[in-house]
Amino acid sequence: MTALKNDRFLRALLKQPVDVTPVWMMRQAGRYLPEYRATRARAGDFMSLCMNPELACEVTLQPLDRYPQLDAAILFSDILTIPDAMGQGLYFETGEGPRFRKVVSSLADIEALPVPDPEKDLGYVMDAVRTIRRELNGRVPLIGFSGSPWTLATYMVEGGSSKDFRKSKAMLYDNPRAMHALLDKLAQSVTSYLNGQIRAGAQAVQIFDSWGGSLSAAAYQEFSLAYMRQIVDGLIREHDGRRVPVILFTKGGGLWLESMAEVGAEALGLDWTCDIGSARARVGERVALQGNMDPSVLYANPAAIRAEVARILAAYGKGTGHVFNLGHGITPEVDPAHAGAFFEAVHELSAQYHG
């Protein structure tokens, strides 16, 4: 494989020295970019875009072409590709978000679910990873990703998005055996899927536990974190002569960082409700940290964005082990120039904390 021209993202995850704090942004290839909207219109719909490796590559690279400060690319895909490959029938309702034609409601439903083969059943994702790596030609590392078992399970049991997770939590408490069976099958599927991405060329992977923060502390340990640990234990950790770092991100998980740091991932993602300085004091000896600016700051003017970047950099302090990011994904209404101001500020203001 081509040598990396910029590896500061990987170096920071491994807590090796860097010249400036690396930066990327969740949903950096997305609807806030006019070039993304144009490519999506050409594709016809969101899933057609995800399932076309050439177009998925095109939108993955768009933010890098616009923002030379970006230190990583992230695969353009969706966390719900796994349930779709399990036969749940993913589709998108205008204004409603993702929906499934089939809903999981019993142990029999769960036992009937296959564990997808990444090359046979999700080959379009693996092809996209290979295409992106080829086109990146070593510019920056490529991040692969998956949803966490608990997060995927909520969509499969609810039949789509949910505000209160009533069906998922009812299964968790009424029929924990069924929920554990579903989570175990999803953990196997995620492990296989992420290993497929790593073999195809992903140089780091992130597990998005978007809804882990909806759980009680005890339920989080048993029904979310335990299965992320199972995944991390089964991942390929060395590939193509390099360590493949793993990032765990539980939105709303700031209370549980100590437990998360014991799972074996190189880094933890933080949402904006955490103080990054406190997080570093708690777990910074064991893991790198990624985050954690409130995405809504990007609605403010560039001077305010710069001030918030400066505050977060100062809160983290000197040295490596920090990847700057938002605390969740960028929203569609943000001015692309404000994203550019964010990236510029991170590199300009962070040099003083290194070297």
Swiss-Prot record:
CDD domains assigned: URO-D
UniProt binding sites for substrate: R27, Q28, A29, G30, R31, D78, Y155, S210, H328
Catalytic activity: uroporphyrinogen III + 4 H(+) = coproporphyrinogen III + 4 CO2
Keywords in alphabetical order: Cytoplasm, Decarboxylase, Lyase, Porphyrin biosynthesis
EC top class named in words: lyase
Pathway info: Porphyrin-containing compound metabolism; protoporphyrin-IX biosynthesis; coproporphyrinogen-III from 5-aminolevulinate: step 4/4
EC number: 4.1.1.37
A GO CC term attached to the entry: cytosol
One Pfam family hit: URO-D
GO molecular function, a single term: uroporphyrinogen decarboxylase activity
A GO biological process held by the record: protoporphyrinogen IX biosynthetic process from glutamate
Keyword RNA-binding appears in the UniProt entry: no
InterPro entries, per database record: UROD/MetE-like_sf, Uroporphyrinogen_deCO2ase_HemE, Uroporphyrinogen_deCOase
Cellular localisation: Cytoplasm
Annotated site residues (Transition state stabilizer) in this chain: D78
Record text on subunit structure and interactions: Homodimer.
Assigned protein family: Belongs to the uroporphyrinogen decarboxylase family.
Function: Catalyzes the decarboxylation of four acetate groups of uroporphyrinogen-III to yield coproporphyrinogen-III.
PANTHER family: METHYLTETRAHYDROFOLATE:HOMOCYSTEINE METHYLTRANSFERASE RELATED, UROPORPHYRINOGEN DECARBOXYLASE
Protein name listed in UniProt: Uroporphyrinogen decarboxylase
Organism of derivation: Pseudomonas paraeruginosa (strain DSM 24068 / PA7)
